[in-house]
From Swiss-Prot:
Belongs to the lyase 1 family. Argininosuccinate lyase subfamily. Pathway: Amino-acid biosynthesis; L-arginine biosynthesis; L-arginine from L-ornithine and carbamoyl phosphate: step 3/3. It is an enzyme of class 4 (lyase). It is found in: Cytoplasm. It comes from Shouchella clausii (strain KSM-K16) (Alkalihalobacillus clausii). The keyword Amino-acid biosynthesis applies. It catalyses: 2-(N(omega)-L-arginino)succinate = fumarate + L-arginine. This is Argininosuccinate lyase 2. One of its GO terms (cellular component) is cytosol.
């Protein structure tokens, strides 16, 4: 089969060479964007009298026919035509005749593919942002029922201080809010049109780049034709934001996995998001959480792969840049799938409040409260820290917890202790008193829930 660019060649490549160089196996995912960009381009060509209205109408009708066939899954692509652009151009010529060959006037595949990816990423980024909001809503809904449910807070995976379970869940809400913001900000770079930049130097045809940008709902155009076709930083930025998002999901997955283990029993993951064992009948494995944790590495890999591909490329377009798409497609699929699974998983977890309550009363996570108690009575905090450390050691030696020590032991340690110390040491008192801004105190958690709900409401209205 002859190539659309084959005029200067005297021989054709072997089929296996064509297959190695072809990208149609994956860039056919850009079929809708490619047709949309082409319709805008040919509309502009007619407006600028580069093509006649009749020619433009023929081409647009042909493109819309291909669009319908694509939606119905009726288009057949060929590796011999390399990519989605040449495949569609060949199919268009087959559909409407030689006039289809005028579509590419004033355009290169270099600005064409860049336009496709800008259109694709704009849509996908907006859909991922919506999915983040859905997960955030699930976290808020779960948190609203557990403002006064207490869970051990950890540092170094050692119990540190008790916190509200709602406060813990909302930590991820705010991480996701920053992820949302990063993606939202990236749209400023995505929503710029490279169409009309040509191969690298622009074109001699009197095209109107601003008009095609307007037709495609871009906010502006690339100001430099070399830049427009040479860089993929907008994809790098998307991949970096996605990698950060997946890192946050992976961390919460790790906690869900730990919390669902027999050693914790803080939560139970719904059967719909777990699997069993082929040999051990008792097993219930948190597979979906583990898969999201594992798939995080795929997204990291896509980011590092593209950065490595781009780092040594001279301007302008190089065939290496064909490698920019598969990682992008895979990341979009991975992130969207992970967010969808996660929202369902969070909505349906069963919280074992009894296990959590038992955990916060069978440790020394209220020790900081003792030190704060002494500090509020005038003892320097560093001295208070040492006094409480010795009380913890005494309790460990006696095989009890701080609430179990008799008042005499406290008064022997410091005359500042009084009978009210036992109320101070109660887990709900410990948590409830931490009402500094952003703290785990119940009033602060309720305020945080209000702010979170306001953000979600604004997104719905927007």
């Amino acid at each position: 089969m002859s190539k659309l660019w084959g005029g200067r060649f005297t021989k054709t490549a072997e089929q296996w060479v064509d297959e190695f160089g072809a990208s149609i196996g994956f860039d056919q995912q850009l079929v809708e964007e490619d047709i949309t960009g082409s319709i805008a381009h040919v509309t502009m060509l007619a407006k600028q009298h580069i093509l006649s209205e009749e020619e433009a109408a023929q081409i647009k009708n042909g493109l819309k026919t291909l669009q319908k066939k694509a939606a119905a899954g009726e288009l057949v692509f060929s590796a011999a035509q390399e990519d989605i652009h040449l495949n569609l151009e060949k199919l268009l010529i087959d559909e409407i005749g030689p006039v289809g060959g005028k579509l590419h006037t004033g355009r290169s595949r270099n600005d064409q593919v860049a336009t496709d990816m800008h259109l694709y990423l704009r849509t996908q980024t907006e859909e991922i942002m919506e999915a983040i909001r859905t997960l955030q809503a699930a976290l808020v809904k779960q948190a609203e029922g557990h403002v006064e449910t207490l869970i051990p807070g950890y540092t170094h995976l050692q119990r540190a201080q008790p916190v509200s379970f709602a406060h813990h869940l909302l930590a991820y809400f705010w991480m996701l809010e920053r992820d949302y913001g990063r993606l939202q900000d990236s749209l400023k770079r995505v929503n710029i049109s490279p169409l009309g930049a040509g191969a690298l130097a622009g074109t001699t045809f009197p095209i109107d780049r601003a008009y095609t940008a307007e037709l495609l709902h871009f906010e502006g155009i690339y100001e430099n034709s070399l830049d427009a076709v040479s860089d993929r930083d907008f994809i790098v930025e998307f991949l970096a934001a996605s990698a950060t998002l997946m890192m946050h999901l992976s961390r919460l997955c790790e906690e869900l996995i730990l919390w669902s283990a027999q050693e914790f029993q803080f939560i139970e993951i719904d059967d719909a998001f777990a699997t069993g064992s082929s040999i051990m009948p008792q097993k219930k494995n948190p597979d979906m959480a583990e898969l999201i944790r594992g798939k995080t590495g795929r997204v990291y890999g896509s980011l590092f792969s593209l950065l490595t591909t781009l780092k040594g490329l001279p301007l302008a377009y190089n065939k290496d840049m064909q490698e920019d798409k598969e990682g992008m497609f895979d990341t979009v699929k991975t992130v969207k799938g992970s967010l969808r699974i996660f929202a369902g998983m969070i909505e349906t977890i069963t919280v074992n409040t009894d296990a959590m309550a038992k955990a916060v009363t069978s440790d020394f996570s209220n020790a900081t409260e003792l030190a704060d108690y002494l500090a509020t009575k005038g003892m320097p905090f560093r001295e208070a820290h040492e006094v409480v450390g010795k009380l913890v050691l005494t309790a460990i030696e006696k095989g009890v917890y701080l609430l179990d020590l008799p008042i005499e032991v406290y008064k022997e340690a410091s005359s500042l202790f009084a009978d009210d110390i036992y109320e101070v040491l109660q887990p709900k008192t410990v948590v409830g008193r931490r009402n500094s801004a952003g703290g785990t105190g119940f009033e602060q958690v309720k305020l945080a829930l209000g702010k979170a709900n306001d953000l979600l409401s604004q997104s719905i209205k927007g």
